[in-house]
Amino acid sequence: MNGVEVPAKIQKRIERLRQEINDHNYRYYVLSQPTIPDSVYDELFHELQKLEKKYPETITPSSPTQRVGAEPLKVFEPVHHEIPMLSLDNVFDEKGLRAFDKRIRQRLKLDKPFEYVCEPKMDGVALSLLYENGELIRAATRGDGYTGENVTQNTRTIASVPLQLRGNDYPELVEIRGEVLMPREGFAKFNREAEKRGDKTFANPRNAASGSLRQLDPRITAKRPLIFYGYLIGLLKGKDFPKNHCDVLKWFKDWGIPVISEIKVVGGIEGCLDYYEHLVKTREKMPFDIDGIVIKVNSLQVQAELGFVSRAPRWAIAYKFPAQEKMTVVKAIEFQVGRTGAVTPVARLEPVSVSGVTVSNATLHNFDELYRKDVRVGDTVIVRRAGDVIPEVVGPILAKRPKKAKLIKIPSRCPVCHAEVIKPEGEAVARCVGGLYCRAQLRESIKHFASRRALDIEGLGDKLVELFIQEKLIKDITGIYQLKKSAITALPRMGEKSAENLLTAIEKSKKTTLPRFLYALGIRGVGDTTARTLARHFHELDLLMKASIETLQEIRDIGPVAAENIHAFFHQKHNAELINKLIHLGVHWPQEKAVVKSEIAGKTFVLTGALKSLTREEAEEKIERSGGKATSSVSKNTDYVIVGENPGSKYEKAKALGISLIDEEAFLKLLKSKGVF
């Protein structure tokens, strides 16, 4: 009230109301033990709103009334995950689960069973909540695991997410990871009301949760019945990790973070199997969709020892429920061509609803599968959503097969570019050999070429790529570097500023590195790690392009299949011409230096926190060029952890495991002393 002091009695009442509302939220969402009816809760909330409106100087960011009110966003800002938000590996039967347990015990050299934590696998949207001194400062989606989207404004509208952690025993900085869900009851009610208004409905609760969280206007998200459950800690600063994962979940409850009540600590894999059988029988009684169980090693020390492999932890697995199945008819079998030339048969089906999703197309995986299952046009088939996600054809019902059911043959020519289709002996996949020249492979090739780990062309997204191809502005990947401002501004929703920004990003991408360029080419089986291996070995692109299969096979980590793929790619005339044209258009990179023998060679490094002089990717590239290996997670196999500003939980894990810690200055000295920097 413009300089008028707030009466002490009013200030006290406001603080009391906030405390009561937060306590009732805690009892409702965390304890599932509400003590007042909704009408009384609403009265308390409205009283607080009125007082804060009258005395706006009393409003704080963590007040329960401040969940909604921000202006709509124009775009979601990207968020880099200090610790990658990795997905889990899946198993679909008891054999797979026992193999997971066996791998762990062999790695740890243990014969006896040990503790696991079992929990329902929620079918929602992964979310990261970052709290500083107990206050929610950021919420981000998983994205690709490394970069997500900032959805803080929308997340603040979810009533089960505390804006301020309870108590005072929380760390200086903590990242709480979990899942955003839309309960079945809320989903059904939302769709009923949407139908009445003539608005779009959602196919299933997961799509509804995802769509609600990614609304640019938080006022829309606020109207959606979303709930959050925590299940993991990411970053942690100012507090030591507890002994076990179940202790982390107790922290969450104490701080006011909802945790699923069906979580159970079990002894050995037999306990996991019992838990799975119990949840199979009771899953429909749960208020939200689940699609399996998640099994985690309970000991955090053992988790750190096991570490990660590829994009998943070794210490956790998802055991999926059997997929739901329905019958329908195959109307046609068509062919799709992927980025690496794989020609995949796809069944076009009479639309059928499976697990709440309308399915009209289903993968047949490859021609070996097609013939093994003996699926024909006209067949009545069983369709299921594999892992409750990807639709696939299980097989035909032979008793219903019509006399004119048509068997499909492998095409001899690509249905798009008419290049030869080959199916090597012993391989299940048939492939178009057209490479970068194939128009069907063009769209995915361009998206891959422009991706963050490749040439990193900011602003060249999926929709824009589609538009450029549709308007015939890009006929192959070299077309990216021949785009004109006048042609771009002539397109819908592309003004001068947008065109200038895109052209600037394209120009910037011309200066790259050999590993990035090799990865960008999309050679089958050549990921960013293999690309770095090839660049370190050959140093020059010309030498790599001329290498024989035998020479390639001599390189560590390059097997016979990868060697054949690399050799075949560079010996396709179209591919060689496109590479030369890209170089002629200005794509260039510094010559790769030979790996110098140093303290870095043969060592495994992990980075945590922000470096002042280098980006994370630049630091990783320099480590690789020096013969070292850069990984994203700390394990007992890590040699050094490079500690930057505001280090995360990797720092704490490294200390616990006794791993050598070096700061940025020491790391730079290592590089400079060997002429790498």
UniProtKB/Swiss-Prot annotation:
One BP annotation, GO: DNA replication
Record function comment: DNA ligase that catalyzes the formation of phosphodiester linkages between 5'-phosphoryl and 3'-hydroxyl groups in double-stranded DNA using NAD as a coenzyme and as the energy source for the reaction. It is essential for DNA replication and repair of damaged DNA.
Binding site for Zn(2+): 414, 417, 432, 438
Pfam family, one: Nlig-Ia
Name of this protein: DNA ligase
The family this protein is said to belong to: Belongs to the NAD-dependent DNA ligase family. LigA subfamily.
UniProtKB keywords: DNA damage, DNA repair, DNA replication, Ligase, Magnesium, Manganese, Metal-binding, NAD, Zinc
Classification via InterPro entries: BRCT_dom, BRCT_dom_sf, DisA/LigA_HHH, DNA_ligase, DNA_ligase_AS, DNA_ligase_CS, DNAligase_adenylation, DNAligase_N
HAMAP family xrefs: DNA_ligase_A (MF_01588)
Disulphide connectivity of cysteines: none
GO-annotated molecular function: DNA binding; DNA ligase (NAD+) activity; metal ion binding
Keyword DNA repair: yes
Cofactor (UniProt): Mg(2+); Mn(2+)
E.C. number: 6.5.1.2
Positions with a binding annotation for NAD(+): 38-42, 87-88, 119, 142, 179, 296, 320
Residue positions of the active site: 121 (n6-amp-lysine intermediate)
Species in which this protein is naturally found: Coxiella burnetii (strain CbuG_Q212)
One cellular component (GO) term of this entry: cytosol
Domain of life assignment: Bacteria
Domain BRCT: 595-677
Catalysed reaction, written as an equation: NAD(+) + (deoxyribonucleotide)n-3'-hydroxyl + 5'-phospho-(deoxyribonucleotide)m = (deoxyribonucleotide)n+m + AMP + beta-nicotinamide D-nucleotide
SMART domains found in the cross-reference section: BRCT (SM00292), HhH1 (SM00278), LIGANc (SM00532)
UniProt KW Magnesium keyword: yes
